[in-house]
């Protein structure tokens, strides 16, 4: 059967935390959807190297970013874009990370921790002008967060699958 390193050139699911990454590895998500899995920034090293080699050869790769709903999650796309900027538009980056409204709709608890309060001003351009985006900005400033792994594993896989699968050959968790 195919291994996790076999599906790394066309599209890659990039996880920001090990717990989420392992859920996708142990459940064989990469086999169901033919997608590479990467724990940011470079684990497994073979996958990270193949992505850079593929992009350097002039081929396109879509990187799907999966992250928690927290300050680091909201900054994750910018971090990945900076790391792949040398490849220009060949690295297509799609942010699939959880947002506060999604967490609420999925029944994921939104927690608050005063130790996570961030008095620095969050870049308003990153959040835009919509009510939902301004609400997220305020929640992040007050230390709110929601973790992906609070979803049951199969539900997390299906939620992610539904946001990536685009063709009939993408059979799996749908």
Task: Report residues per predicted region.
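Nucleic-acid enzyme cleavage-core boundary/entry regions
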Residues: 1-61, 71-174
